[in-house]
Amino acid sequence: MVDRRNFLLSSGLAGAAMALSARSQGAPASFASATYAEATVIDALGGPGEPDAKPDTPLSAKALEDVRASGLTAVNLTVSGVGSYDKDYDTTIRNIAFWNAQIAAHADALLLVRTSADIAEAKRSKRLGIIFGFQDATPIAEDLERVETFGELGVRVFQLTYNRRNLVGDGCVEPGNAGVSKFGQAFIERLNERKFLIDLSHGGERTTREAIAASKVPVAISHTGCAALAPLPRNKTDAELKMLADKGGVVGIYLMPFLRSAGQPTAEDLVRHIEHAVGVCGEDHVGIGTDGTISPVNFNAAFRKKFAAEVAERRAAGVSAPGERPDVYTFLPDLNSADRFLHIAALLSKRGFSDARITKILGANFAQLFATVWSG
């Protein structure tokens, strides 16, 4: 039986997206535009570009317009391949070259981030700071010297695993939950020594706990949800979240299907997960990592066909996670605009969050984490 909420979602996604786009022309009254304009706003996992663009497509005028409209200061952009030891090193090198070319071509809008000072400069100059990050350790293979290689190329965030097992540890869909390997321990030590941020977003529960314990500095979970609200493998338990916060880390809540156990999530689900994470971790340890593009989704038949094909491709490759479905989309229909962070701020304000707390969640917490880890 289809309840009214899911019927409205399934039949009205396009309408919701259009309504949100219309509302985007004016700032939400409950959180001042001036306050947002002064905030450091960080998407802990995302990137510029249009969702329906093919890989390696140069940024369009529309994508750059959306970057400026977003109000974002910086974004952790995935440059690594995932899930393939055969291909991911070469894929990562190509991705880094592509994004370096995009940053050079649009130096008035984009800035490569290597230090915390670069984030401050991005804010001052009203550009988007691009932080190169990994979502899998597969490009490293068994060669820890590659950490330095990729560091020289600008990478600043290293996620230990994707969903499956790799040489470092188990991802969140591995039934064995084997944790961090001996090689993984050495990898963590090398990342600490070289002052790179460790990300545990896709790690299995044991991998997450062991990596937090092993790291000498705070770590990130850049994009996840709360398992207490939606018990799916991609979400983190309260115990994991508290352990992260107790070591000084920050968790980013995503705008993904996993915010609900079933059905299409909305902004209300996102707010609930943020509220829960703040309750577990404290307001100094929560942020946002959308796991999506800055530009909104053009929700039409072509998008639905492409999305269904991507879900099937991920399943065939063995990298998908429970909760990924062709009819549950990887965006929130009522936050489908480039300035979604401003609307999230307004929703949190209506829930009673102070401007100071909202500013931390928008990006100040991740900015502080970057400064702590990168500067040592």
Descriptions of predicted regions:
Residues V2-S21, Q25-G176, P231-G376:
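N-terminal hydrophobic targeting/anchoring segments and the immediately downstream early-domain regions
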